């Protein structure tokens, strides 16, 4: 019973933090502001999440699974998982380009060591599934090292400035280099890039963000406990 109460409280904190992070911005939202929104003392909140980065880490864990599930639904039936990989980064970059709050959230996830480690570990496991046919003799260490490079490419693609190239140029360069690291043949690289740029990737990015917020808000106690057991 006590454990259930703990998980219920953690879920309430996560739901409130998600809403505030994606409405006001991750950087602009303090632990104190989250605690106030929950009518909870800061000390009580930090009992569950010692810092804001711990909260972000919980969200990133949930986002990695959710976003991968969602992005596969946007590619044509029978399409390879490689296309889903290409669309995921493209949609993330597109939403970051038009939504500063979303950009702040995604860049924070790629900046803090705790969350960056989650992203790299998750993506390395996924890469074995997606790129295994091109890297049949690779070890786990090689996938891990590749994702260190790739996470930097992904961050640079989303982190735009006034001097940044247009999104289609950035996506072309990023996806080509990512697939090149994983030894994908040039013909396939060009085909996937062309096809993903023909998609409504900005609208898809918007929809994925909306659906993630709804997913967090609608997650019940039982579903949250199941997520915790998978970690």
Outline where the language-model segments fall.
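Short glycine/proline-centered loop/turn elements that form peptide/ligand docking sites
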Residues: 1-4, 16-19, 28-30, 38-39, ...
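Helix-turn-helix
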Residues: 12, 20-54, 58
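Solvent-exposed, amphipathic alpha-helical segments
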Residues: 16-24, 70, 74, 95, ...
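Hydrophobic alpha-helical connector segments
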Residues: 58, 69-102, 120-125
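Short linear capping/connector segments at secondary-structure termini
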Residues: 72-75, 105-112, 195
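Secondary-structure edge/capping motif, primarily at the C-terminal ends of alpha-helices
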Residues: 74-75, 103, 157-162
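Amphipathic alpha-helical packing segments from all-alpha helical-bundle domains
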Residues: 110-158, 165-176
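C-terminal peripheral helix-coil segments that are non-catalytic and often amphipathic
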Residues: 128-132, 136, 163-231
């Amino acid at each position: 019973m006590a454990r259930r109460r703990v998980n219920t409280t953690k879920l309430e904190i996560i739901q409130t933090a998600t809403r505030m992070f994606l409405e006001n911005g991750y950087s602009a939202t303090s632990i104190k502001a989250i605690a106030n929104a929950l009518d909870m003392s800061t000390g009580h909140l930090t009992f569950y999440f010692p810092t804001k980065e711990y909260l972000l880490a919980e969200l990133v864990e949930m986002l990695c699974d959710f976003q991968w599930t969602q992005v596969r639904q946007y590619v044509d039936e029978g399409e390879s998982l490689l296309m889903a990989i290409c669309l995921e980064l493209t949609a993330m970059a597109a939403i970051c380009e038009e939504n500063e709050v979303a950009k702040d959230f995604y860049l924070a996830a790629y900046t803090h060591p705790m969350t960056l480690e989650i992203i790299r570990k998750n993506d390395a496991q996924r890469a074995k599934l997606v790129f295994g046919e091109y890297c049949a003799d690779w070890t786990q260490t090689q996938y891990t090292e590749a994702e260190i490079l790739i996470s930097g490419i992904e961050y640079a693609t989303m982190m735009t400035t006034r001097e940044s190239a247009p999104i289609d140029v950035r996506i072309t360069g990023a996806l080509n280099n990512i697939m090149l690291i994983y030894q994908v043949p040039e013909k396939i690289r060009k085909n996937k890039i062309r096809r993903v740029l023909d998609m409504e990737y900005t609208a898809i990015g918007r929809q994925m963000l909306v659906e993630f917020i709804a997913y967090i808000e609608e997650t019940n106690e039982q579903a949250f406990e199941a997520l915790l057991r998978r970690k």
